[in-house]
Amino acid sequence: MINLKIGQKLQLEIERMGINGEGIGVISGRLVFIPYALPGEEVLVEITENARNFSRAKLVKIIEKSPNRVKPQDRAYHEMSQSHIMHLSYPMQLEFKRDVMRQALEKYKPAGWRNYELRATLGMENTLGYRNKLQFQVRRLNDGTVIAGLYQEGTHHLVNLDNCLVQDPKTQEIINHICRLIEKFDLPVYDERKIGGIRTVMVRRSQKTGEVQIIFVTSTPIILDGQVWPELREEPSKRQKNSFVKFDKMLSALTEEFEEIVTVAVNFHPRKTSEIYGERTQILFNEKETITEGVLDYEFELSPRAFYQLNSEQANVLYGEAVKALNPKKDDRVIDAYCGVGTIGFAVAKKVKSVHGMDITPESIFDARENAKRLGLKNCHYEIGKAERIIPNWNKSGHRATAMIVDPPRTGLDDALLETITKFPPEKMVYVSCNVSTLAKDLVVLANFYKVEYIQSVDMFPHTARTEAVVKLTKRDEPLKIVKFEHLEEERKAEAFAKGKKRGRRPQKYGKY
């Protein structure tokens, strides 16, 4: 195998795209990953990193351009994330996202994977302005200018996103105005080295009603109407007081400028961690404590901290596909794991005997219960906690599920939940995935107990390498093999350790597109 040196320039042809959207070329049997390069292109690249089995390079020049290459519309495109694919025509983005699923299956090889039906990705007509929520870090530059945006991938460089084209225009307008108000009222802004103040701002807008809710995350207490929150146990020093965020003028100016704002909250997060939120949240302004959103044929309420899909338009497509895959029957007893505010469960509640959901976020379960009441769904029951703890209790109390919906975070299903599912397998199951790699990994276990009927890819995030998928699973008459979960857990821990050791750093939890 050829030895490549850092800084070495070479010419190669791009053969395919990798799971993160990068182009992949091969030189003397060695894989080279090049962000922003497309299949079929002849490119000049410069080697930036060498690992044992592959190299990474940056694109220097496109010698022969792909007919599928288009000019990115977003001026901050190359700074935001190397997994963006705005340079690829949209029809080919959809095909790429189906291929990403194929690559993940080929890597993990769950039982029968070659015969899985991979359906064409369901895309959008308008691929800009689709993100209903932003969660931007805030920083003050040396000249006093306040910017808001996201960290450049793998760095602590904050990219100023003052005109992000995939963001809902109203949320973008509001965050830009917030930055100007912070400057105007000289409010303290967080600096991870020495200064406390505002560190993150979340703005979410309902696509159904236009209502807006905002969360300010601060590392220091706030002052509103002369009151300090959170309450302090001892008198603060003068230096500490100077870092307190005086919210009176900001709150008045913001709510007067934007009549769409119905909720403003503050979250106190004093610790120096990469977690976005702290444990305590206080409502500052509440014309309404929730916003009203809609999906399929019903409406529901969302608290500021509750989870909901970032793309409201495609959420209709995603949840519609989930309902279709479940094929609900009147005698079905459904478990909605990772239920959030209950959105998928509500879509089937009137067609089944019962829906039992759980989530670890208290705000989400509160919203789920209130939404169920408002919708008149008396057959819905929700609990706070982990599925692997709650499901066995439900089984003991007589609620043995015949159908299950899982919609886990990007980390996939917890091993304990996988074990619980295999001990109490429902007759049918729908897996809604936001990470094809962890989906394929989970199918290694699930495919022993369930037949994969099909996988339907849904494009929730146009112009990024991310995709979501709905998997229809039907219980097998007999398991293909018995899975030893103690070995599975050891293997995954070893894999995670090796990945972390190879990267040489802890993964960033700050948001990126």
Swiss-Prot record:
EC assignment: 2.1.1.-
Molecular-function annotations in GO: rRNA (uridine-C5-)-methyltransferase activity
Protein's gene: ywfF
Keyword Coiled coil in record: no
Isomerase among keywords: no
Keywords assigned: Methyltransferase, S-adenosyl-L-methionine, Transferase
PROSITE patterns: SAM_MT_RNA_M5U, TRAM, TRMA_1, TRMA_2
Active site (UniProt): C434
UniProt-recorded name of the protein: Uncharacterized RNA methyltransferase YwfF
Source organism, top-level taxon: Bacteria
Positions of S-adenosyl-L-methionine binding: Q309, Y338, D359, D407
SUPFAM superfamilies named among the record's database cross-references: Nucleic acid-binding proteins, S-adenosyl-L-methionine-dependent methyltransferases
TRAM domain mapped to chain residues: 3-61
Family assignment from sequence similarity: Belongs to the class I-like SAM-binding methyltransferase superfamily. RNA M5U methyltransferase family.
GO biological process: rRNA base methylation
InterPro entries named among the record's database cross-references: MeTrfase_TrmA_AS, MeTrfase_TrmA_CS, NA-bd_OB-fold, SAM-dependent_MTases_sf, TRAM_dom, U5_MeTrfase_fam
